[in-house]
Amino acid sequence: MSRIGKLPIHVPAGVTVTIKDNVVTVKGPKGELVQEVNPDINVTLEDGVIHLTRPTDDKNHRALHGLYRSLINNMVVGCSEGYKKELELVGVGYRVSNTGQLLDLSLGYTHNIYLQLPKEVKVETKSERNKNPLIILESADKQLLGQICAKIRSFRMPEPYKGKGIKFVGEEIRRKSGKSAGK
């Protein structure tokens, strides 16, 4: 058995799960998510617990078993508690502001970068004096949230010499020493 796939998924109170024709729908206080499951993987819901089974111990089936268990678990957690990520802008003159779902980033380029966020992602920006600006993103969809964070981070990746760029809060950037002075 797959170490991850064999684990049951407990559905918390306030979250409803429906399974119909290999499509799993999870509704909760934070939103609604839908995931299509491979027809080879069998998904059952009994007494508030989701179980996944596979037909054979074939390598492909073992991989899919763990994959879909993790995806459905992420959906249940996302719809009940939600996911939150914080990005920090490190650098002189780096600024961020938002107007609704439009993010305005000033990252030292000759132009500002505007990013339209999907409606499933809630965004909040914090800019305090003498502190690095923060972007706080919340969503029920873990995959979408990670993709948006990676896109924002790609505009100015943290560099190893001064540590300037967009990084996750609490992330350690591996630093390098600069050029050694000549004799």
Curated annotation (Swiss-Prot):
Signal peptide: none annotated. Coiled coil: none annotated. GO terms for cellular component: cytosolic large ribosomal subunit. PROSITE patterns: RIBOSOMAL_L6_1 (PS00525). One of its GO terms (biological process) is cytoplasmic translation. Part of the 50S ribosomal subunit. Belongs to the universal ribosomal protein uL6 family. PANTHER family: 60S/50S RIBOSOMAL PROTEIN L6/L9, LARGE RIBOSOMAL SUBUNIT PROTEIN UL6M. This is Large ribosomal subunit protein uL6. It comes from Parabacteroides distasonis (strain ATCC 8503 / DSM 20701 / CIP 104284 / JCM 5825 / NCTC 11152). The lineage of its organism: Bacteria, Pseudomonadati, Bacteroidota, Bacteroidia, Bacteroidales.
